[in-house]
């Protein structure tokens, strides 16, 4: 544990470095810390913090900058996020953007608003589409061709064209969809397949044929995995901390292109409550030392279905980004739950 004096100086150093992007010297710390300490005393404290691995001194400057470990201590124990007028503006902007509609479009809009408000990259783990259905409907297209319409609990509407061995009348299709909705809604199609095997003797042959065709056609519709949407990644080209080194920049866009590490990070954060902060060089889940990711899970009807976040430099204004992520997650949850 740091003593109060060391905590104050470390907090001041990180706040000044985030604001100005330059190594922080003893004169700046004396001016902004509110402590009446001599330059020699401040330098001694800085030496102690350096030994603890919380700050380092770049070769080109007498000032110091925080390490990933220093940032971790800062966000865990020193960071204060207080309500402000900016938070009201964020709330209005997110509400305006996240209008009820098709869930996938709402989720994509959330990634966009995260990027626009933070001026970094917005990222979102889209929910795994449900293996269960809420409602289905059959529409006759022509002889032996039927449109299968599947509505999932999340509100997604998915269509498949079915080819059948025989023709069905519109009344037969209505009867079949009514039976399936009454007896099987809320189940997975695998469960429907199992139940059909058990109940096959109780059903007419044409009904069984149609339902088996529906189960077969629906398999690839409902079995889609999680995907990562990224918005505004080019904004990071304007962040010197990330774009000044070409090798680092290539690695950054490899992360965006392959998405594997982001998928793993977002999946981990979906199991936690509230805002999580992952700091490069401190978390194995962040592949670039100069990069941080601020995440929060979002819900549908009280159940966590995905994660969203902001990707930016380690030197970001966490007290500004955290409310953006938190508010967006809460309002996205509300919007999706109203579908």
UniProtKB/Swiss-Prot annotation:
GO terms for molecular function: DNA binding. SUPFAM superfamilies: GAF domain-like, Winged helix' DNA-binding domain. Keywords: Repressor, Stress response, Transcription, Transcription regulation. The keyword Transcription applies. GO terms for biological process: negative regulation of DNA-templated transcription. Transmembrane segments: none annotated. The keyword Lyase does not apply. Pfam families: HrcA (PF01628), HrcA_DNA-bdg (PF03444). InterPro entries: GAF-like_dom_sf (IPR029016), HrcA (IPR002571), HrcA_C (IPR021153), WH-like_DNA-bd_sf (IPR036388), WH_DNA-bd_sf (IPR036390), WHTH_HrcA_DNA-bd (IPR005104), WHTH_transcript_rep_HrcA_IDD (IPR023120). HAMAP family: HrcA. Belongs to the HrcA family. Negative regulator of class I heat shock genes (grpE-dnaK-dnaJ and groELS operons). Prevents heat-shock induction of these operons. This is Heat-inducible transcription repressor HrcA. It comes from Paraburkholderia phymatum (strain DSM 17167 / CIP 108236 / LMG 21445 / STM815).
């Amino acid at each position: 544990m740091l003593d109060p004096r060391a905590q104050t100086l470390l907090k001041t150093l990180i706040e000044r470095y985030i604001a100005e992007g330059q190594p922080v010297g003893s004169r700046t710390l004396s001016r902004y810390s509110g402590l009446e300490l001599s330059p020699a005393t401040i330098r001694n404290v800085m030496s102690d913090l350096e030994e603890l691995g919380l700050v380092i001194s770049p070769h080109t400057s007498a000032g110091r900058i925080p390490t990933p470990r220093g940032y971790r201590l800062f966000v865990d124990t020193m960071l204060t996020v207080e309500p402000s007028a900016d938070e009201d503006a964020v709330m209005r902007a997110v509400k305006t953007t996240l209008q009820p509609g098709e869930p996938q479009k709402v989720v994509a809009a959330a990634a966009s608003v995260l990027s626009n408000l933070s001026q970094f990259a917005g990222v979102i783990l889209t929910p795994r589409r449900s293996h269960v259905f809420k409602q289905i409907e059959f529409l006759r297209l022509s002889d032996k061709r039927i449109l299968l319409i599947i509505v999932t609990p999340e509100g997604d509407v998915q269509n498949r064209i079915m080819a059948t061995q025989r023709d069905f009348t519109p009344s037969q299709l209505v009867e079949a969809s009514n039976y399936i909705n009454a007896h099987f809604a809320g189940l997975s199609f695998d469960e429907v397949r199992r139940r059909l095997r058990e109940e096959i003797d109780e059903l007419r042959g044409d009904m069984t044929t149609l339902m088996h065709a529906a189960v077969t056609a629906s398999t690839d519709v409902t079995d889609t995995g999680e995907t990562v949407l990224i918005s505004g990644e080019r904004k990071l080209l304007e962040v010197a901390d990330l774009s000044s080194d070409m090798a680092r920049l290539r690695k950054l866009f490899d992360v965006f292109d392959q998405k594997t590490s982001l998928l793993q990070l977002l999946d981990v954060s979906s199991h936690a409550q509230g805002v999580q902060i992952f700091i490069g060089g401190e978390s194995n889940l962040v592949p670039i030392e100069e990069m941080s990711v601020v995440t929060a899970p979002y819900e549908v009807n009280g159940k966590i279905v995905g994660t969203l976040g902001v990707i930016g430099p380690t030197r970001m204004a966490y007290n500004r980004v955290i409310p953006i992520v938190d508010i967006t997650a809460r309002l996205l949850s509300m919007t999706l739950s109203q579908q």
